[in-house]
Curated annotation (Swiss-Prot):
Protein name: Succinyl-diaminopimelate desuccinylase
Binding site for Zn(2+) 2: D107, E143, H360
EC primary class: hydrolase
UniProt keyword annotation of Zinc present: yes
CC cofactor note: Binds 2 Zn(2+) or Co(2+) ions per subunit.
Pathway: Amino-acid biosynthesis; L-lysine biosynthesis via DAP pathway; LL-2,6-diaminopimelate from (S)-tetrahydrodipicolinate (succinylase route): step 3/3
Catalytic residues, chain numbering: D76, E142
Organism: Rhodopseudomonas palustris (strain BisB5)
Family, similarity comment: Belongs to the peptidase M20A family. DapE subfamily.
Length: 388
């Protein structure tokens, strides 16, 4: 059986586990069995948090020396949506026309399957042991609140004395074809609620009331008028987006007492969460003057900005991609947040996996040929990494 076929069979086994967060549905067990059979020491660790579901996680390692390369990812998936809209069952793992179908095919059970297949191939070619250490850090809590997953598993590993030299997260990083993009960082994310207080009253007597709606509209305009920055060497400009405006007023003859607007900021490495909040508060105060009564309620966030500077590790991954695909990948920091933000606090990390065009969609799918290529790229990474 070829390694690409191994990746396919592993992916199918994972896809047939309906592991919608927080359910595991046997997905971690599939990986644990494969890795234990290959000589890994595996640990299943369950974390709890008040108000959140308990989540099972997997950490497996082979080898006890440096360098230590970690593959990280998640086996949980988003809900499939309308089951009847799928041309193949969302958890069928069916292959038709060279395409593998299933929720998680690209995000990111397919990527995990390729990493496992590549590692098994590498070990088979090198006497069953790496010239260093290889680990898998896999959570079932990435697609939801992400409080009982990677962030706690990393701390658990650190408390045991585990250290990582580099990490690859198998998120679907590519835009159109395998090898076109490596994610070397992510913007931070901070959400908040802008609240403007007015004075409720009858619309026929506006002089006896204070309407917060024109005021919140003016503040939204003011906060959007001036850019937060011009971007940096690795990041696009930071961006503030208002996502809703609400007054909770069902009446047409009552001026509301309060208006609220939700917003999110995706910010680059010019800012920290604290400095960003201070900047927005300063601009809000200037826009309010002495007339408008407004404040911001900031929502909790664990999504800090991070970047892995291009260097030997990104060069190694780039060379492995070029060998298999002939492409030179773009190193970028676009897109949303991922668990790589937690890993970046422990070691340099990049994200490289399948093509993300169908992730979270009905009929999520990946070409089987892409599984072949990604497995070959990961094999190349392993060969270079443990020779360097």
């Amino acid at each position: 059986m070829t390694s690409s076929r191994d990746a396919l069979s592993i992916a199918q086994a994972l896809l047939r586990c309906p592991s919608v967060t927080p359910a595991d549905a046997g997905a971690l067990g599939v990986l644990e069995t494969l890795l234990k059979d290959a000589g890994f020491t595996a640990h299943r660790v369950t974390f709890s948090e008040p108000g959140a579901a308990d989540i099972d996680n997997l950490y497996a390692r082979i080898g006890d020396g440096a360098p230590h390369l970690c593959f990280a990812g998640h086996t949980d998936v988003v809900p499939p949506g309308d089951a009847d809209a799928w041309s193949h069952g969302a958890f069928s793992g069916d292959v038709e026309g060279g395409l593998l179908y299933g929720r998680g095919a690209v995000d990111m059970k397919g990527g995990i399957a390729c990493a496992v297949a590549a590692v098994l191939d590498h070990l088979a070619a090198h006497g069953g042991r790496p010239k260093g250490s290889i680990s898998f850090l896999i959570t079932g809590d990435e697609e939801d609140v992400a409080v009982n997953g990677t962030v706690k598993l990393l701390q658990w590993a650190a408390d045991r004395g585990e250290t990582f030299d580099h990490c690859i997260v198998g998120e679907p990083s590519n835009v159109e074809a395998i090898g076109d993009t490596i994610k070397i960082g992510r913007r931070g994310s901070q959400s908040g609620m802008l609240i403007v207080d007015g004075l409720q009253g009858h619309v026929a007597y506006p002089h006896r009331a204070s309407n917060p709606i024109p005021d919140i509209a003016a503040l939204i305009t003011a906060l959007n008028d001036e850019p937060l920055d011009q971007g940096s060497a690795q990041f696009q400009p930071s961006n503030l987006e208002f996502t809703s405006v609400d007054v909770g007023n069902p009446a047409t003859n009552v001026i509301p007492a309060q208006a609220r607007a939700k917003f999110n900021i995706r910010f680059n490495d010019h800012h920290t969460q604290d400095s960003l909040k201070a900047l927005i508060e300063q601009r809000l105060a200037a826009a309010c003057g002495n007339r408008i009564r407004a404040r911001i309620e900031w929502l909790p966030s664990n999504a800090d900005v991070f970047v892995t500077k291009p260097g030997n590790f990104t060069d190694l991954v780039t060379a492995s991609i070029a060998d298999v695909t002939g492409r030179t990948p773009d190193l970028n920091t676009g897109g949303g947040t991922s668990d790589a933000r937690f890993i970046a606090k422990y070691c340099p990390v990049v994200e490289f996996g399948l093509v993300g065009q169908t992730m979270h969609q009905i009929d999520e799918r990946t070409p089987v040929a892409d599984l072949d290529q990604l497995t070959a790229i990961y094999r190349g990474v392993l060969e270079r990494y443990f020779k360097s």
